[in-house]
A protein has these predicted regions:
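A short, low-complexity linker immediately N-terminal to eukaryotic Hanks-type protein kinase catalytic domains
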Residues: 49-68
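Conserved alphaC helix of the protein kinase catalytic domain
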Residues: 70, 134-138
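Short beta-strand micro-motifs within the conserved protein kinase catalytic domain, predominantly
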Residues: 147-158
Length: 167
């Protein structure tokens, strides 16, 4: 499953040590239940650490559905985060459009500020990014491609896919 998020809202619910209903706490590194542990027994993630700018803070909730965890890779155009889908319980990947050098984000915030002199380039690249994932969404039946299920805008461009378990 691949998700996309991008809109012009700037406020999200944030909690770095996320506790869900029914007393379940999630590790922001692997999205497994960790109870009261500060270090995840599954992946070793330290729940007391904060995600560094310009990445989304741990526990950011998008669309009142997706809980954003640790950034797992970045490529100059976008950053992928491990995430939890509160609706299905699935581990998903959220991909956020974050083109290096064209924006800024203060640590601990979700608001992205587009550099004024780069706004046209930023918007063109964002449109290209969104169109790419819309095409992938239409081709979701092809097993060789990532399965894009949800594309939405909050402020920057993001997408998500269902995480595959190894083993």
């Amino acid at each position: 499953m691949f998700l996309w998020y991008n809109s012009f809202q700037t406020k999200f619910e944030i909690d770095t040590y996320l506790e869900l209903s029914n007393n379940m706490s999630l590790c922001m590194g692997c999205m497994q239940e960790i109870g009261d542990n500060k270090i995840c027994p599954s992946c070793g993630f330290d729940t007391t650490e904060k995600q560094q700018a310009p990445f989304l803070p741990y526990g950011t909730i998008l669309q009142n559905r997706y809980i954003v965890g640790a950034g797992i890779d970045t490529n100059g155009e976008s950053t992928r985060y491990i995430s939890h889908d509160k609706q299905t319980g699935d581990i998903v990947i959220i991909c956020e459009f974050l083109p290096i050098g064209l924006f800024s984000r203060e640590e601990g915030t979700t608001e992205v500020r587009i550099n004024y002199e780069n706004r046209l380039v930023y918007n063109k690249l964002k449109d290209d990014f969104l169109n790419y994932y819309r095409i992938l969404s239409e081709l979701r039946e092809l097993s060789a491609l990532m399965n894009v299920h949800n594309i939405f805008e909050i402020q920057t461009g993001e997408t998500g896919e269902k995480a595959c378990e190894s083993g």
